[in-house]
Amino acid sequence: NTFKNIKKKLRRKRLLAEKRHLEKAQAGAGGNEAARRKIKAALRRKKAVLKPVAVILIAVFVVLAGFLFLEKRTYRNYKVQVTSEQEDTVSTQYTYLSGKILRYSSDEVSLVNNKLETVWSQTYDMQNPVADVCGDCAVIADKDGTSMVFLDKNGITGTVSTSYSIVKAKVSKTGMAAAILDGGDHTWINFYNLDGSLVAENQTNIQDPGYPMDVALADNGVVMMVAYQFVDSSETTSYIAFYNFGEVGQNEDDRIVSGYTYDGVVVPQIQYLGSNAVALRDDGFTIYSGRQIPKELKTVQVEQEIISTFYDENNIGLVFKNDSKDKQYTMQVYATDGKLKFSKDFNIPYTTIRMSEIGRASCRERV
């Protein structure tokens, strides 16, 4: 009996051990399955995060590649789409207006589409017409004369007969125009609507603030930029003044909200480039920023003599003479924050240079 009892206890002990082993094995299998499920869930979450990130990275790469392509591409040939014979090639001039060609001479202005079909044509009488275009608006002034016409893509919108000879006229995208008039001892800077009505006039003196060299208008049609030049202690000095004809400038003397003096510097040309303005100097350029009260943003000075300038809303270009026999010229193009984008030597004789509306490439007219 004792032997049987011992045998039963051993068998019971063995069965209990096998049961515990089986339970442990089953528990381990369940734990592994749970672990596998956790790993799969983590992988799914990781994929859900990585997929949009990958899409964004691909999109950024495509945009960057496209940007670099547009910035660095160059054109080495062209295709003539259509030609037209012009009888008076000496006095007729051309520029762009609303994606079409604005053709003007001493007695007529017309808008021509890309098939050289005349959209409209109107007449006037001038001796030395000079045009300025901004967006869908334009002004044609008789330089050293007294006539101006304002126009948009639909035709002439207004005319003006001035009391003094016209030095220069500029227009803004909103249709506001400004003109420098030479009255001898005094000069006038007049401000006009696109219909030709006078908004404001400002008389200037050669001694103070100086002789107006150029005028430019902001896109908002409220701020006017003027470059003056005067002689101070036998030194040529330039003064850049910003006039505000809105509420901001109503309490300021002569509506001048900001002004900057540059000793020993000549500023023959100024221009608004979108929200920024630039003063093109004989030693480089200065950029201004601010819609109502413009402030100096950056000045870029160069040592070489500048022989040409060109620009659009995103770029400022300078051309210098090059000492190299193989390359006569050097072109430098800057962003409107003053950073140099590229510099390139070239050897193409030209009479005019500008930024093209297509691809922002520089266009040259051969001599």
Tell me what each language-model feature is.
Residues 187-280:
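Solenoidal tandem-repeat scaffolds enriched in leucines and small polar residues
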Residues 119-173, 297-300, 307-314, 318-325, ...:
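Structured, soluble extracytoplasmic/luminal domains of envelope-associated proteins
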Residues 108-110, 146-150, 185-191, 232-244, ...:
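Structural motif
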